[in-house]
C-alpha cells in the first residue's frame, strides 16, 4: 500500500493494491471422426497451432487412438478464434472435423 499526499487540501490518500487474477485458460481439443484424413489433421495442427510436423503427428495419433487430442491452451478469446478457424477450414475442405474448447 502506498501513501500519496494530496497537495491541494493536505489529505493523505491510500492506494489500494489491485488484486488481479490470471485470465481463465481454455484447452482447444480436436475430436476424432471416421472421415477426416489423418494428413489433413496434421496440416491443421501445424497451421493453426504452430506445431512442428512431429508434434502435429503425435497430436493426430492421440485424436485417432483416444478420440480427442489437446492442441493447445489459450485465453478464452484466442481459444474461441482457433476453434472457429479450424472448423471453418475443415468445412471449406469438405471434412467433418470437430474442434471444441474446454476450461483448462
UniProtKB/Swiss-Prot annotation:
Entry protein name: ATP-dependent Clp protease adapter protein ClpS
A Pfam family this chain is assigned to: ClpS
Top-level taxon of the source organism: Bacteria
Stated role: Involved in the modulation of the specificity of the ClpAP-mediated ATP-dependent protein degradation.
Record-stated family: Belongs to the ClpS family.
Annotated organism of origin: Paraburkholderia phymatum (strain DSM 17167 / CIP 108236 / LMG 21445 / STM815) (Burkholderia phymatum)
GO BP, one annotated term: protein catabolic process
NCBIfam families per record: PRK00033.1-5
Subunit (UniProt): Binds to the N-terminal domain of the chaperone ClpA.
Amino acid at each position: 500500500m502506498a501513501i500519496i499526499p494530496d497537495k491541494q487540501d493536505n489529505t493523505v490518500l491510500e492506494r489500494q493494491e489491485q488484486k488481479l487474477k490470471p485470465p481463465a485458460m481454455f484447452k482447444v481439443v480436436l475430436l476424432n471422426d471416421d472421415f477426416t484424413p489423418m494428413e489433413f489433421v496434421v496440416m491443421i495442427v501445424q497451421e493453426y497451432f504452430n506445431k512442428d510436423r512431429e508434434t502435429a503427428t503425435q497430436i493426430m495419433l492421440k485424436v485417432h487412438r483416444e478420440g480427442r487430442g489437446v492442441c493447445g491452451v489459450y485465453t478464452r478469446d484466442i481459444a474461441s478464434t482457433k476453434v472457429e478457424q479450424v472448423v471453418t477450414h475443415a468445412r471449406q475442405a469438405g471434412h467433418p472435423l470437430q474442434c471444441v474448447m474446454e476450461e483448462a
